[in-house]
Amino acid sequence: VQNKDVFSDVLVSLPEIRDSRGALTVIERDERYSFERVFWIYDVPEGSERGGHAHRTCAELLFAVHGSFDVELCNGHERKIFHLDSPSTGLIIRPMIWCRLFNFSADYVGLCMASQKYIPEGYINDWQTFCDSL
């Protein structure tokens, strides 16, 4: 089974610099954080979910820049829920991991860094197709 250790080393802590002017968190390009696309999510209606898919080859790094949300990851056999509520903590979603985002706070603003540009064929949007692909 691919990604058997789906839950190991998926949380990323970035340095946070605070002073009287506010806070700053920075991420610099390195092998772990190579990205081709960045997008943000906001104004999520109460009770809504996002995600509900897996990527064949794309990895993502998710952040709650403001507010909070929950992310459920599944490798087809095991599931784990992560609660993100800090702009300096990110969650890596590796390829071939089913991902569901939910429980968004009303003030949520999220940032996603993706390792590839948008490729519709790279998505698996059906749970059974995902399981059959493992």
Model-predicted regions and their roles:
Residues V1-L91, A106-L134:
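Non-catalytic, conserved peripheral segments adjacent to functional cores
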Residues R100-L101, Y108:
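Structured catalytic cores of enzymes that bind and process phosphorylated ligands/cofactors
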